[in-house]
């Protein structure tokens, strides 16, 4: 009987360890808050993408205050930012989504910007 109890306890401990380890890993398609180097890389992507947007027919925005950055693996990477953007004359609270598919030579980056108080959404791909 003690052997059965010991095996049950050992099994529960193993299941707990596996569940804890799985919770720490990013699930493909799952959304996760970005921290550390991942957050730093995502912020660099935001700045570079906003700069690229300004070289075309898009507006010229600068990220002032980023309050949240999430990442998701979906046929590439989708980063979502809650950010205050400044266009030189006005500051707006916005949601910015940047979807990158680096293996595509053309149309591998898409940016969508939706700001509070605005009716439309900016949507550009290059």
UniProtKB/Swiss-Prot annotation:
A motif (Secondary area of contact) lies at residues 72-76. Disulfide bonds join 94-115. GO terms for molecular function: cysteine-type endopeptidase inhibitor activity. The record marks 29 as: Reactive site. Keywords: Disulfide bond, Protease inhibitor, Thiol protease inhibitor. Pfam families: Cystatin (PF00031). GO terms for cellular component: extracellular space. GO terms for biological process: sexual reproduction. InterPro entries: Cystatin-like, Cystatin_dom, Cystatin_sf, Prot_inh_cystat_CS. Transmembrane segments: none annotated. The keyword Disulfide bond applies. Belongs to the cystatin family. This is Cystatin-like protein. It comes from Drosophila melanogaster (Fruit fly).
């Amino acid at each position: 009987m003690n052997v059965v109890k010991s095996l049950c306890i050992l099994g529960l401990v193993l299941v707990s360890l596996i569940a804890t380890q799985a919770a720490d890993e990013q699930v493909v398609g799952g959304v996760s808050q970005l921290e550390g180097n991942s957050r730093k890389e995502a912020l660099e992507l935001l700045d570079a993408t906003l700069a690229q947007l300004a070289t075309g027919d898009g507006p010229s925005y600068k990220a002032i205050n980023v309050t949240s950055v999430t990442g998701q693996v979906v046929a590439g990477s989708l980063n979502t930012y809650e950010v205050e953007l400044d266009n030189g004359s006005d500051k707006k609270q916005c949601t910015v989504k940047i979807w990158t598919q680096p293996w595509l030579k053309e149309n591998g980056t898409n940016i969508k910007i939706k700001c509070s108080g605005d009716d439309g959404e900016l949507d550009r791909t290059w």
